[in-house]
Curated annotation (Swiss-Prot):
The lineage of its organism: Bacteria, Pseudomonadati, Pseudomonadota, Alphaproteobacteria, Rickettsiales. Keywords: Signal. Residues 1-19 form the signal peptide. It comes from Rickettsia prowazekii (strain Madrid E). It holds the Pfam family DUF2673. This is Uncharacterized protein RP697.
Length: 82
């Protein structure tokens, strides 16, 4: 019974932690308006989280924004031809 109580307490307190962790949106649904609403740090974190496949799923205007706001190293990691 004590073990069950421990498990229930862990689950009860773990859910809010996982729920508050940042979730990246579907790349195809991202808009430049959403990006502009982010803090600079959040924008950089989002760029750092992108994979080449996700970059290719972005809309043309978001791809343009990424091109204008990434370093050469980030572009290379995404497989973007400069």
């Amino acid at each position: 019974m004590k073990n069950l109580l421990k498990i229930l307490l862990i689950i009860a307190f773990a859910n809010p932690v996982f729920a508050s962790s940042m979730q990246m949106p579907d790349p195809a649904s991202v808009t430049t308006t959403q990006i502009h609403a982010m803090s600079t740090n959040a924008q950089q974190d989002w760029i750092a989280s992108l994979t080449a496949n996700q970059y290719n799923m972005l809309s043309p205007d978001v791809q343009k924004w990424v091109m204008e706001n990434t370093t050469d190293a980030q572009k290379q990691a995404l497989g973007i031809n400069q």
